[in-house]
Amino acid sequence: MSAEIICVGTELLLGDIVNTNVQFLAKELANLGIPHYYQTVVGDNPTRLREVITIASKRASILLFTGGLGPTPDDLTTETIAQCFHSPLVEKAEIIEDIQDKFKARGRQMNENNRKQALIPKGATILPNPTGTAPGIIWEPIPNVTIMTFPGVPSEMKRMWSETAVPHLKSQGWGKEVIFSRMLRFRGIGESSLATKVNRFFNLTNPTVAPYASLGEVRLRISAKTASETEANAIIEPVAQEIIKIAGEDYFGQDDDTLGKVVGELLRQKQQTVSVAESCTGGGLGAMFTEIAGSSDYFWGGVIAYDNCVKMSLLEVSAEALDHHGAVSDIVAQQMALGIKKRLETDWGMSITGIAGPGGGTDIKPVGLVYIGIADPDGNVESVECTFGDRSRDIIRYLSSCTALDQLRRKLI
């Protein structure tokens, strides 16, 4: 028994719309403990849609459709499903009445085209749409195959799913065992290196452990299928603790933890403060601190020192350092960190200076070269050289800010 998600709409194939529906439904199926192995996107073409339905109905027992329920000629989902299973369409008076009421509430009259939305396969149950004019259906056209259809509008689909579809699935016995997951997050280690360290955990069956790589970090998802969250935690916790111990300082948090949140908590625990001096990141590092509510407890402010004159006047970077080493150098990064620490009288001072591109690089100092400076409460200062490569400007700036936060985190733990 498994589910398959079928998203209908040429706009999805063309990339005009981001398919958030499939992400939502995939997570919901996992939460209900319903396995699903296939996701299909098909355009508004009845021939190709029939092919998809024919294949899906042979390999899945729950078919979830989104899109193609509107009143226009290219909205063909319902009638194509009916054709596949040789069922006539019947007009439902209660659907027409509901659509008319919704138009009336908006001071409008229902268009005759909307009558199309009242046609459903004979024997199907209406899946009500509380907000829109496109209802869905719940239908078992053949034994062991249940079809559910939803409009493509995400807000409408989500409400129909939670209010009607989920209770129906639970009444059929689904959801007795659900999947609970915990995401462990790591910085400063590559996916392959982490996978090598924790390779033995990938053979587990309950819980399962799977790696995910994302920009600036690696994640491990630990998932358990149980009847309750308490049981899941009892299974997940020992595995999580073993992995955290193996990863050491490269582990920084779990689930919704961000570097900014984790570093902020460490500063708060130590009752210490921090300030930042930024060049190429243009405030990105400060933004990561201040996106956390209550960050004024430990983050006192920063200076965006883009021009060398600002570096000298506000951060006391020496003209000699700029002349002899250049703005992008370890010496300047160190002086910037000390300068902001002194000016704002914080325990920690941080700095970032680099070449974010796309221009400005040389053979000696290429695009992606970044220096991060950190001055500690005792007045000691260090700098780290980073080479992010010739990547996009946004990525270099983002990785620079993340790396700076991670460097401070490692000094605080």
UniProtKB/Swiss-Prot annotation:
InterPro entries per record: CinA, CinA-like_C, CinA_C, CinA_KH, Competence-induced_CinA, MoaB/Mog-like_dom_sf, MoaB/Mog_dom
Pfam families: CinA, CinA_KH, MoCF_biosynth
Protein name per Swiss-Prot or TrEMBL: CinA-like protein
Family per record: Belongs to the CinA family.
NCBIfam families hit by this protein: cinA_nterm, molyb_syn, PncC_domain, PRK00549.1
